[in-house]
Amino acid sequence: MQTYSTPLTLIIVTSLFLFTTQGSSSNAVEPTKKPLKLANYRATCEDRTRTLVTRLNTSHHSVVWQRYDIYSRYMRRMPPLCIITDAYKETTHQGGATFTCTRQNLTLYNLTVKDTGVYLLQDQYTGDVEAFYLIIHPRSFCRALETRRCFYPGPGRVVVTDSQEADRAIISDLKRQWSGLSLHCAWVSGLMIFVGALVICFLRSQRIGEQDAEQLRTDLDTEPLLLTVDGDLE
């Protein structure tokens, strides 16, 4: 009896440990390495309200709304936002955002950029899943869209969002481009003048050489032939 008590105790302790580990890991945040197949893409701005509406028929079914964080190396499955079983509507909070869930839609309030992610609806009765890829843009980006001057590069690669700053950036950019073009034209013009001066000097030197040779030939043709006779006088 004592021979089997130690292995039996070991088996019981190991089983309890595995059961406890599985139970605690099911409630923890679990990373997933497999990307989700996304069909729906949505976008909104910070501090706005956005509603995600499912196309699945989830009437009278238990559903789960869940969020996947995409800022980590792998998409992390966060704790469920809402689990709708008997209640028609449920409101919950995660971070600074507020979520109101029903079987058909998920409404998000007070969003920030950190709430960007994949929002998943799973029908627990049929097993159907629908994913929404929700992008939350910062306020500066949305203000830039409203002024219709978004993503204009200002000094130091800064995105200019204010209209007056954008006007100043456009003017300074045009001045910079014009000065660069003027400098380039001046450099090309100077180079062409220098090359032209060299060509003119070369041609003039050749012409002067030819004139000197012609003058020398002319002088040789017109110069009288002088004969000197040396002799003794008696």
From Swiss-Prot:
Keyword terms: Host membrane, Membrane, Signal, Transmembrane, Transmembrane helix
Q: TM segments?
A: 183-203
| Assigned GO CC terms | host cell membrane; plasma membrane; viral envelope
Where it sits in the cell: the answer is: Host membrane
Q: Give the signal peptide as a residue range, or say none if absent.
A: 1-23
Q: Which domain of life is it from?
A: Viruses
The topology of this chain with respect to the membrane is: Single-pass type I membrane protein
Q: Which cysteines are joined by disulfide bonds?
A: none
By what name is this protein known? Membrane glycoprotein RL11
* Name of the gene this protein is made from: RL11
